Amino acid sequence: MAVKKSRKRRVKKNIESGVAHIHSTFNNTLVMITDVHGNAVAWSSAGSLGFKGSRKSTPFAAQMASEAAAKGAMEHGMKTVEVAVKGPGSGREAAIRALQTTGLEVTSIKDVTPVPHNGCRPPKRRRV
């Protein structure tokens, strides 16, 4: 008989406050909730919830990803959260609003989008 691998159980941490990092690109939205030291507590993305293709970039997909990450963080006892938003995507506001409706208290919202001081040449303009 094969030896069973002993799987490590998830430890419930008691974390009162943390930081919600929302990375919103043109193709997807990733929400990662960390403690104040930067250790990951919960994460979710539009793609991991089953949204495929162009549906990943919608505000609704960002809302669902944000709610899923918030539920995971609240299982560890999180109550208050600071929000750091990065990127130009369409799911920025929807993700923040979803965090507020799940019951997490949002204390501050910061935009941490990296802005070049005339660095690399940007991609060509889109013609839609």
Swiss-Prot record:
SUPFAM superfamilies: Translational machinery components
A single Gene Ontology CC term: ribonucleoprotein complex
Family matches, as NCBIfam families: PRK05309.1 (NF003698), uS11_bact (TIGR03632)
Designated gene of the protein: rpsK
GO biological process, one term: translation
HAMAP family the record matches: Ribosomal_uS11
Pfam families given in the database record: Ribosomal_S11
PANTHER family: 40S RIBOSOMAL PROTEIN S14/30S RIBOSOMAL PROTEIN S11
Function according to Swiss-Prot or TrEMBL: Located on the platform of the 30S subunit, it bridges several disparate RNA helices of the 16S rRNA. Forms part of the Shine-Dalgarno cleft in the 70S ribosome.
The protein's assembly and partners: Part of the 30S ribosomal subunit. Interacts with proteins S7 and S18. Binds to IF-3.
Stated name of the protein: Small ribosomal subunit protein uS11
Gene3D superfamilies per record: Ribosomal protein S11
Aminoacyl-tRNA synthetase found in the keyword field: no
Stretches of the chain forming a coiled coil according to its record: none
Keywords for this protein: Ribonucleoprotein, Ribosomal protein, RNA-binding, rRNA-binding
InterPro entries: Ribosomal_uS11, Ribosomal_uS11_bac-type, Ribosomal_uS11_CS, Ribosomal_uS11_sf
Family, similarity comment: Belongs to the universal ribosomal protein uS11 family.
